[in-house]
């Protein structure tokens, strides 16, 4: 599994959709999630522009955090949606919410169904806990809390797992064909070996097993190569795989990856 440790997330893999493409559709940057029509138009145009046979949703890694109360600044001509002021003083303040009930998520779900009905294979990018927390609280504070009161962070991770699992169920019902799990802010280079291992064992592995069961035959699960590297370093990668021993590892934003017939790695 050494190939995963060599994977780097380049700037071109970070950008979900270009401001120029949004502008060409006559949509204001701050309105990318304002309507189902806007979402479907952007996703379809981005798919066609990249030569993909799938539509990629959402267009940022902030949707789940916003549903949980994060202050998310809207996209503009220079950048996509991003975190504003921090809203949590402590990870233990994370509220239990229904992600699918938030306005943006609800429109994304309807857009997923509309894109599917329009002949698109829909790939939905599900964000992990560190990416979510990074929108709501300083990561330095998260690690301090994790060190002093690990049970507080553990309880927050349990709540996150429940919320994201319920959202996965709704995504499957909406007709999403692939769920791509990634945690850009939670890779081993940022967390370090101690917290990387804790996150893998406390959240990532049990969560992937849980949503794999939720997906069943309705939806395929993909994991980011950076997440795969974290699982692999602890010897957990195959434990996250289905009983047959295969797991799909793929960067959905990297050209050619989803087109490959060999994206299932043993």
Write out the residue ranges for each language-model feature.
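Short beta-strand segments at enzyme active-site cores
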Residues: 55-58, 122-125, 176-183, 218-225
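Surface-exposed amphipathic alpha-helices with a cationic face
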Residues: 112-117, 172, 208-216
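Active-site-proximal loop/turn and secondary-structure-junction residues that shape catalytic pockets
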Residues: 60-61, 128, 185-187, 225-229
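N-terminal basic, low-complexity leaders that serve as flexible interaction/assembly modules and, when applicable
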Residues: 1-76, 197-222, 231-266
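Active-site-proximal, glycine-rich beta->alpha crossover segments in alpha/beta enzymes
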Residues: 70-167
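Glycine-rich, proline-tolerant flexible connector loops at the mouths of alpha/beta enzymes
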Residues: 54-74, 92-100, 178-197
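Active-site-proximal loop/short-helix segments
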Residues: 123-145, 174-200
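Conserved, mostly hydrophobic/aromatic
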Residues: 47, 115, 164, 171, ...
